[in-house]
Amino acid sequence: MEWIADPSIWAGLITLIVIELVLGIDNLVFIAILAEKLPPKQRDRARVTGLLLAMLMRLLLLASISWLVTLTQPLFSFRSFTFSARDLIMLFGGFFLLFKATMELNERLEGKDSNNPTQRKGAKFWGVVTQIVVLDAIFSLDSVITAVGMVDHLLVMMAAVVIAISLMLMASKPLTQFVNSHPTIVILCLSFLLMIGFSLVAEGFGFVIPKGYLYAAIGFSVMIEALNQLAIFNRRRFLSANQTLRQRTTEAVMRLLSGQKEDAELDAKTASMLVDHGNQQIFNPQERRMIERVLNLNQRTVSSIMTSRHDIEHIDLNAPEEEIRQLLERNQHTRLVVTDGDDAEDLLGVVHVIDLLQQSLRGEPLNLRVLIRQPLVFPETLPLLPALEQFRNARTHFAFVVDEFGSVEGIVTLSDVTETIAGNLPNEVEEIDARHDIQKNADGSWTANGHMPLEDLVQYVPLPLDEKREYHTIAGLLMEYLQRIPKPGEEVQVGDYLLKTLQVESHRVQKVQIIPLRKDGEMEYEV
């Protein structure tokens, strides 16, 4: 056992381990591709079983060195070619590798499903393990012959094989996960296997292709793919820095809904699901609009859908009964907002019309004070999803919207939230909702209410909107551009549209005309 203290023995051991690992890279790649065909629960077992059987095979080959040496002796000749048992094994392995790599490439490129539902799981599992062992036997022959030529001690060779296989076992799982999570890398690996299969066939016919050429080509390809993966990583990092995950997801879904599949970042499974649709619309326009509204629901706040306090029909708490009855006759809502005096700034609560009706049917005088109910109170920055949850928990459909100083800015109802998804819902009476008041004119322009939310406007007119804006209505957009209250007749260009103020009352923009422009900045119609 004096050879254990010999430094040259240890140098040979380390060299053999490195060679085993280098020669085993292609084997690991093939294992990663084969293991993907199995159900997730069987993949680890297939990798471990295949590599352990491969290690056992290499140890048996090393134990039969005398037989192994005879494999290089010529068996027969055909014309100018002389074949040994090793050459025949190389030919078989090369053609096997070419066949498997070609079939795998065909499945990847044609999008075929490699899973066969009619096949038994056990047979499939052992089929994959068998392929792993057969392929490893082919690669083992070269590595074992190399080991025999480099080291004289059998124990050193066996130790190198055991250590190398153990390292391959540890690396196989992360390598499998990495390869299968990057479709372009799978194609690259299959291309490597084609090159290796071709080199094995050439070696079987006696044409020696230096391994350095193969490794140089593989290394160059890996470098190019690394640059490609770096570019993808930088693109995703740039997108994540400029847009939230919710925004990127919403944009990708909306591109899919509009049929722009080539612009959306899709994984392989999603792309395969959509490939059969061609250029057909997957969803109709109504479905696309509704899904877009749902995806953007949490991006909107209650202040963007509220009815301004200036548009609220209210009644004084101390109003005489006759005035209350007159208001009930012309009222079209189920609730009345009660104020302390004629000032709409001081909102006390709401009164349900049905409660007033019950008072009247009982012959009692109408008394607003005893019927006042306190609605929910939302901060103006509250997103719609939390607002919807509060409506559900409180079992009420009405809320006041207040600013940071506690002043009431407006009211919002459950119907307002529902309309952000389904669009404007008609009432039993023909009432025009001022917030959705937009009509298309005969000349191609639009006339809209100044208090129409921009999120609703873009459903009709695709204006570019600043995601960090602090305004919510068309009037707010005009004031942001002008930095003052617009005057009638003033115009502002926003993207490819000209916004013209038509009507202003009490410092409030009532009507706005939206005129589409040509690319040269001229109007698309005659004034």
Swiss-Prot record:
**Entry keyword Transmembrane helix:** yes
Keywords from UniProt, A to Z, are: CBS domain, Cell membrane, Membrane, Repeat, Transmembrane, Transmembrane helix
* Primary location class: membrane
Output the CDD domains linked to this UniProt entry. Answer: CBS_pair_CorC_HlyC_assoc (cd04590)
InterPro entries in the record, alphabetically?
CBS_dom, CBS_dom_sf, FAD-bd_PCMH-like_sf, FAD-bd_PCMH_sub2, Integral_membrane_TerC, Ion_transp-like_CBS, Transptr-assoc_dom
Protein's membrane topology: Multi-pass membrane protein
The record's SUPFAM superfamilies line, in alphabetical order, gives:
CBS-domain pair, FAD-binding/transporter-associated domain-like
> Which PANTHER family would you find in this protein's record?
HEMOLYSIN-RELATED (PTHR22777), UPF0053 PROTEIN YEGH (PTHR22777:SF30)
Name of the featured protein: UPF0053 protein YegH
Where does this protein come from, organism-wise? Shigella flexneri
Taxonomic lineage from the root: Bacteria, Pseudomonadati, Pseudomonadota, Gammaproteobacteria, Enterobacterales
In the UniProt record, the gene name given for this protein reads yegH
